[in-house]
Amino acid sequence: MSLNHQEPAATFDDDTSHQHFKIYKPYGFLSQFVPETRKRKKLLGELFHFPDKTMAIGRLDHDSEGLLLLTTDGMMSHLIRSKSIEKEYYVQVDGDISDTAITALQQGVEIGINGEKYQTLPCKALRLADEPSLPARGRKIRDPRHGPTSWISITLCEGKNRQIRKMTAAVGFATLRLVRVRIGNIAIDAMQPGEVQPQTNFNAALIG
């Protein structure tokens, strides 16, 4: 795990009493500090000695990885979560995804949320010409002899529970790997799984 300090960015406000971080949440970790059950799970506190009252802004599920923002500032967390900020994901799906499926994702598909039907909002979706340069995942995803896979980019301004996995399943292509690479103007860049980078603030994510 490496710790990289970035140059200060333009400030969202003058409050310097809070601390902010961006991290690469590894596969297999929960986006929280306190377990919800007695079952042993990997938690964010194992990655870094975060200050008290640090909270994740949004979540990535256990099987997903990539960019996650953390802060001790509840107001900033609320502001970011309340805005329609783009979140971009690189998604590896099972099979050779079709143009028809890409178009359906762009237009919105019907998925299930808490037992109710939900129509996803229109989003940006495109097929990536080449496999993205991402850190290798520790656990093998699938034997390549089982057929082709495709990489796509999906950019949303909403975030329902396991939404992208449900969206790709709705168009006939199961998600094999899901990596969040951008939130607003904050990108994961060349971070590695488990890496933590302190930030001045997250005002860049609020632009636009």
Residue ranges and their predicted role:
Residues 2-208:
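RNA pseudouridine synthases
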